[in-house]
Structure formats: C-alpha cells, structure tokens
C-alpha cells in the first residue's frame, strides 16, 4: 500500500501529452536485492525496466569509457537506496536525493530532503531530474506523503510499551553470505 498514489497515477499517465516521464516502479524487474553492512548501514537496489526515463541514461556511452561497462550498467540501469545508519539516506531512483533524519525530541523527528545532481549535467537533463524529483519526492509528489506517513506510523509504533524489540526479520529466509548473482559482496574490513 505504500506509494499507492504513485502506482495508481502511473497506470493512467499519458506521456504523449507531455507528462513527466518517470521510472516505472510498477514494472520493475524481479531482479532486486538488499545488502546489510557493518554498523547498521544497508542498501536496497533494483534493476530498471525503463532506464531511458532517467536523466543519466544518455551518458551511458561516456560512463562505459570512464568506469567500464559493468559499473556504467549499474549506474544507469539500477536504482539504489543507501542508508548510512542511523539517519542519512542517499537515494538514486525516481530522482536523486539525500534525506537526513534529525531527532528533535523523544517523539518528534525532522526530515530534511535535498535533491542533488552532477555538476556538469546538461540543462535538459537537469530539468528532467527536477521534474522527476517534484513528481515523486516533493511534498506534493506521489511518494513523499506516503513515506512521511510511514515515518509517522513508525514513530507512533515506537511509543508502544508491550514489545521490547522491533522485528526486522522480514525476508530473513532469503539472506545469504558472500557474493550474489550480481557479483557484489560486502566487505567486513578484515580483508
């Protein structure tokens, strides 16, 4: 149900009439993953089915020359949500943003969101990035109201007294150690 507003709107969007072209979460491929790092950091990723909607897409050729084919493919064709525990999120998906969560009091948290982009980005790509940001992440966008409701619900749930711990084991049956099919592996710092 999270991001229902976005998914529902996407199914009715008419790009021919000049609507903001967006990453299509409804048809994301089944290829996705979650990485857990030391000290509580983590990253979610998914492979896109429509990477041409991203502002970075027309830079694929240049990126292949600069960073190699595999890394360029990851930059252009995958989304990433990186959580730097405990309070910073670096997100590269529907657009690019940094979210900072700052506790104000025991029952209040400030969420600040910053859109970011490459310094050398063309005016056309910058405009596309900003429209996608406004479309999904802006306060009036399709995703942020749902996210803020999730934050509010979590905050309310943390006030519960009956349960000592928050169960975060969803998907635990699929956890694996070492590299996955993409060849990515976490580093323990011991190597």
Residues of each region from the PLM?
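C-terminal catalytic domain of Rieske-type non-heme iron oxygenases
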Residues: 1-191
């Amino acid at each position: 149900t999270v991001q229902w507003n976005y998914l529902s709107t996407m199914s009715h969007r008419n790009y021919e009439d000049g609507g903001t072209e967006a990453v299509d979460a409804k048809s994301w491929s089944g290829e996705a993953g979650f990485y857990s790092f030391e000290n509580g950091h983590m990253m979610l990723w998914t492979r896109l089915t429509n990477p041409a909607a991203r502002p970075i897409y027309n830079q694929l050729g240049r990126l292949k020359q600069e960073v190699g084919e595999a890394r360029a493919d990851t930059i252009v064709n995958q989304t990433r949500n990186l959580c730097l525990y405990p309070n910073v999120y670096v997100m590269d998906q529907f657009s690019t943003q940094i979210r900072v969560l700052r506790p104000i009091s025991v029952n209040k948290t400030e969420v600040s969101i910053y859109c970011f982009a490459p310094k050398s980005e063309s005016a056309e790509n910058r405009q596309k990035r900003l429209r996608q940001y406004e479309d999904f992440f802006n306060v009036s966008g399709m995703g942020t109201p749902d996210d803020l409701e999730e934050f509010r619900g979590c905050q309310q749930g943390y006030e519960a007294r009956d349960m000592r711990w928050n169960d975060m084991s969803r998907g635990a049956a699929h956890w694996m150690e070492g590299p996955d099919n993409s060849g990515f592996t976490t580093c323990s710092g011991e190597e």
